[in-house]
Amino acid sequence: MAQGYHSAAMDDIAERAGVSKPVLYQHFPGKLELYLALLDQHCESLLHAVRTALASTTDNKLRVAATMDAYFAYVEDEGGAFRLVFESDLTNEPAVRERVDRVSLQCAEAISDVIAEDTGLSKEESMLLAVGLGGVSQVVARYWLSSGSGIPRDTAVQLLTSLAWRGIAGFPLHGTDQH
């Protein structure tokens, strides 16, 4: 489905998967169900990457960097699978929209939990910041990949981390006056 949902035919999908069309239909009643199964898999991959990044350290600057890098790695390394999540040509399909919205929310909630715990900000305030951090991460990662700018991934992550850290570091750690 690299060319998009509407241009993908079940015959082509079966051929690329190395199975017969009847075998494909044994597992998936139709193209939408196959698409949703792939979407679920890739949404879970993104969520796992974000959660792993957040849990990788207790140093908040390194956490920001790891989380930014998780989005860049996902966009770069998933063989274009990020397009199923972020650039789907089926965003008007309710089942697709629900899954994309859910993974965006789950990623933001994971980020928000860390912000709330570390800063003492309310859940609502932390969530607002988390949606911003997650959104900027995925949009910039997608831009970085599509622009062909030649900026190495680690440099792009470092630049975005610096931008994000200068903002989020302004919220003192819970119970202190320090960053």
Report each predicted region and the residues it spans.
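Short, hydrophobic secondary-structure boundary micro-motifs
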Residues: 83-86, 153, 176-177
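Alpha-helical structural segments
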Residues: 2, 16, 33-53, 62-73, ...
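Short coil/turn segments at alpha/beta junctions that flank glycine-rich nucleotide-binding fingerprints
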Residues: 2-6, 57, 78
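Amphipathic alpha-helical segments used for helix-helix packing
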Residues: 75-95, 109-112, 139-146
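Short, charged helix-capping/linker segments at alpha-helix termini
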Residues: 6-7, 121-124
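C-terminal effector-binding regulatory domain of bacterial HTH transcription factors
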Residues: 171-179
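Helix-turn-helix
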Residues: 1-33, 37
